C-alpha cells in the first residue's frame, strides 16, 4: 500500500514539466504556422497569376491587331493583379503562334515574384493561358 502512494508523489512533483513542454513544443507550432502562411501565399499568388493570365488572354484574343491586344492584355491583367498580395516584380507577356490572324493561338503568360514570410526568399509563380484568336484581321 505504501508503494502505491509513492507513485502519486512522483506525479505531484511534476510542476515544471509544463514549461519544458512549452519550450520544446512552441517552436514546432510556430514553424507549422509560418509554413502554413507560406503555403497559403504561394497558392493565393498562383491563383491570382492564373486569373490574370486568363483575363489577359480573354481580352487579347478578341482584338483586331497585336498592338491593341498587348495593351488590353496588360490593362486587364494588371487590374486582376491589384488583388494579389505584396509582390516585388510582375511580368505580363503575349506569345502569338503563327501571326495575328483569326484561327491562330495566343498564349498569355503572367509571372509574379514575391517574398516568402518564413525565409524572406523570393519565390516566382508563373501561369499561362492559351486561347484562339477570334477577331484577328488578315492584311491584304
Language-model features: locations:
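Low-complexity, S/T/G/P-rich flexible repeat/linker segments used as non-globular hinges
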Residues: 2-3, 109-140
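Alpha-helical assembly-interface signal, strongest on the long, hydrophobic N-terminal helix that forms
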Residues: 2-74
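Generic detector of intrinsically disordered, low-complexity, polar/charged segments
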Residues: 6, 13, 95-96, 115, ...
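Extreme N-terminus of proteins, especially the signal/transit-peptide cleavage junction
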Residues: 13, 102, 120-122
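General N-terminal targeting signals
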Residues: 36, 76, 123-125
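Residues embedded in well-ordered secondary-structure elements
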Residues: 38, 97-99, 118
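Short amphipathic secondary-structure patches
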Residues: 55-111, 139-140
